[in-house]
Each structure stands twice: as C-alpha cells, then as structure tokens.
Amino acid sequence: MIIDRSDILMQMKIKKAIIENFKGIEHCEIEFGPDFNLLIGDNGVGKTSVLEALSVGLGGFIAGIGDVKTKHFTKDEIRIILENTGDGSYNRRYMTPVSVKCCVELEDQSVEWVRRKNSLTSSRSTVEPRTICKIAEKMANEPGHILPIISYQSTARMWMQKKESSENIFSGKF
C-alpha cells in the first residue's frame, strides 16, 4: 500500500518524555528518535514501566477524543518507599505527585503537556494544559490526520495465563 503524503494534514511524533514517581522510576528523561525506537535492558530494569508510563501520558492526548477511554494512574503505579519504623516493621509511603510529561512535535511545532496525579486519594489524573485535548479532538474529527501509535507487549501477559493442570504423580498407590 502506498500512502500519498500530500493528503496528510498533521502528524505527531513523541520527542521526549519525563517520568516522575512511576512504579520503580523516581525520575527518568527519555528522548526519542524520529522513527523506530527500541528499549533494551536486563529484566526488571523498567523497560515496560517506561512504556506503561507513556501510555498514561498519551492518555492526556486521548482525553480529547470522544468515546475513547483513557488510562489513568493506578495505586499500583505510584512509586513506594518503605520506611523502617524501628521496631522491625515498616510503613509504605506513596511518592506523589506521579507524573508523565510528554513533549511532541506537531506540524513543526513543539507541544507539551503533563499528566499528573497529585495524591493517592485523587480520583483521576489531570492534564495540563488542556489545549492538547482540543488538538486531539480536531485531529480525530478531520480526515487526513495521522494519530499517534504506541505499541508494546508486556511480559506480564505470560504470568497471567492459566497453567495447564497436570496429573499428580503422588496420588497413586506405591
């Protein structure tokens, strides 16, 4: 399939993301290349966390598109610090605010917004400034715009699969 680029009105590319207090990430700034980007690292270093944070951050853009559910920060995604109380126990302290700042290029202009949850008890995450929602609404409703795509495959799916039951070898008589 050949795409006639002259029909494209507006496209968006993620240039940079700044992640604060998301899962195991205290602070992380990532700059993205103009085309394909690949995160490589050992197990457990946060590759998937970066992508999950981006999906929440891009939810600020998606919030402008009607009838599309957006992903918010969950309690499990807020970074936790364990504080020793001195008697062999500990307290969990949730590090808020949790935020993702997205910096994108949109028609040769830089556009930035922050998706943030200010406290553990906040019911939703906020998007500031809200102008990104208006831009998304315009892009979704007018033909010729290329909406952003982010795709990742979490290994969490591997652990959630139902295991096949096997025969108990100790159930028979010896």
Region spans (language model):
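P-loop NTPase switch/coupling surface
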Residues: M1-F174
